[in-house]
């Protein structure tokens, strides 16, 4: 009996020691966000909340190492390389362009990403089995392009010409433009491409839109436009140009309309992928998930500044109306 109790005591002590050892070796998660610390705080909080819900707590069993590109797209590769060399066990990254940079920097470290369209961006070839070292949460953004055309047409029934502002060097832009053109054709709307690759081109794009007599502009998301969303909104109002965006943050900054997934929710959702990687699953075997919540947001203050009356039917359907 005494011998049995001794064996049990030794086992308990060993397990306690093992647990302490596991807790002392926190998983190092490199976090790469293409915006600034201030502009990224909401999404980082979503990620942290998702991790905490799963029992992964900063300073206890995980260690977050944060890196920001501050909206400078030319820094993406250098920051990605720095993070890949930092000794991180996992890299979490937000945005298609930043994810592409991390993918170029390492094919060994597991990557959990939140992206607009991982397929169109060439990050993976299959959502169910991503392969390689990437998994995470992604939209199929081209599918949402048609919905945005539908929404802005409902907001402006007389709309007959529209601009699509995008960065043609981004791989996924071609598919989104194609889907926007296809949807616009169904509404007898002609489409004009507007190139916006850096902040200095925003003014020119809206000047061109106004001179061409466009009735509105679809802004295709990328990290540059997201970081400069307040400038986009202000410039659009100054040129009296209605706009629609992918995410509500643009509308919070003064844009007119948005339809797309909730970004904070996507970051929170991605925590499940991080936990699976920590438990030993290969990222390439973890299916990429799609967002579960989409929202229509309308800024009536901006509509008033544009002299636009948004139809009550659209306002009724909105998830949020900013007044």
Model-derived segments and spans:
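Short hydrophobic alpha-helices and adjacent helix-cap/hinge residues
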Residues: 1-323
